[in-house]
């Protein structure tokens, strides 16, 4: 949904105050709104109301309903800080107030919210939702007939957050649950589930944006494909040509966006930050007057900077000790002209390709659904089936677009099961593309050998020397600490249709799919720890210094969900008996070692300084030279 309106209703009854449920609701609101402020969407609206409140302030003049935040879009950091401060100030003033005992204004608050939403958006197509924080599910004094009328009046869905300790059986008897079940797409969550959700790293969904559209060629001549004629490979009798397209399967996560700003004061002497524009200027050092400079001036800078125009700057190539500027005719020839395409160059066994050779973001290669035909789909499906049956991986030459970099990639076949619109199970056949390292990459990175050494007949060479045996055992010992080789996980846990993983709201809510919650514990899904750590520290800085007005900032500890992901906690079993035997390692008792060391020191006891001086005097008196004198 491109447009979204979220209205938060916080129950500020005494029970919510005493059990710190209002503080928990504020923590969720703060995290949610600060996340919304990063995107600053003009179509993402928020508002907030307080129910069961002794303060009355709303558009309908209904008692005990306080609109603490009017409709706001886009959500900004400044507005979020001001809103959380007002809510915190209210809680501090009424934390021990007993005047709101027995107030019941939740139904009135729902009606006020419904009228305000209708007045604000009228007939606009927008996702409307109300998030209610309460610990009293029996708060609604309403009959079944009134629930039907309220369902017709409310044109929004309700997301109920249960802040109490009610069991499932107690929930079933409450009027709140009846109202949630009566309104389509409404849900109910527990408050603790929301707190876990905002403190756990969430895997982002990769959007299916087409990144390549071209030909998958098998048996084609590479030289004949490097032309601008797209029908060249189609006319080759020895070439199997399939029209395919590529979509991103994984996406690299970048750090938080930062801008350079300067602190200034406005007319009201309030500090604010203004972005700084960067201007690049070029200058040269003029050495023409260097001979005329006196010796006293030579101690300082002997160069005179001369500013030059940007139009006078051109690229020069190093040739020996000089710089050469190529003419425009030769500059075009320095660019390697390449044309988009995917050429299969060979196949190898799946077990022969270690995972650490995959060095880029991966992409899905599928039959072209836009420019292809039925024959392309059948040929591509047959290729995937053959590779799956023989457990093969293809090595291909890949060019994503014209004049882009040429890469050698690995194509791994995958079979993904999902349900279509009619709930019919369907298998999607695809190839997963990932870049392989070049020689330049191996110069700066330590990659193990791709394949085991073999003879000309294909027989593997045996390593019989002790050094090779020790190296092999040590390699197995180190690999046993790796989390790379784990039990095979169903592909459905990783690759799912975009419709099953995308949500209709930007709110951080727990997933109703249990498989997705279990995937968060998968040791192969390692989140980008530094990004989440940056975000955690930044949000905590805003909370402490901007909202709580603290003078000092205390860096928060790393959440347990990230701590568990840093250290490998799942590894293979390895029998180290053979390695201990080859290396001759023996376990030595520490107490025995201390006693042997003490005996050796006593045996070779070093005399003190006075003893050495006395020995020197005796030696000097007893020498023949002194007696002759």
From Swiss-Prot:
Catalytic activity annotation: ATP + H2O = ADP + phosphate + H(+)
Biological process per Gene Ontology, one example term: donor selection
SMART domains: Ku78 (SM00559)
Domain (Ku): residue spans on this chain: 254-476
UniProt superkingdom: Eukaryota
Descriptive protein name: ATP-dependent DNA helicase II subunit 2
Note: Present with 358 molecules/cell in log phase SD medium.
Biological role stated in the UniProt entry: Single-stranded DNA-dependent ATP-dependent helicase. Involved in non-homologous end joining (NHEJ) DNA double strand break repair. DNA-binding is sequence-independent but has a high affinity to nicks in double-stranded DNA and to the ends of duplex DNA. Binds to naturally occurring chromosomal ends, and therefore provides chromosomal end protection. Appears to have a role in recruitment of telomerase and CDC13 to the telomere and the subsequent telomere elongation. Required also for telomere recombination to repair telomeric ends in the absence of telomerase.
GO cellular component: chromosome, telomeric region; Ku70:Ku80 complex
Quaternary structure and interacting proteins, as annotated: Heterodimer of YKU70/HDF1 and YKU80/HDF2. Interacts with SIR4.
The protein's enzyme class: hydrolase
Cross-referenced Pfam families: Ku (PF02735), Ku_N (PF03731)
EC id: 3.6.4.12
Bias (Basic and acidic residues) ranges: 608-620
Location of region: Disordered: 608-629
Organism: Saccharomyces cerevisiae (strain ATCC 204508 / S288c)
Family (UniProt): Belongs to the ku80 family.
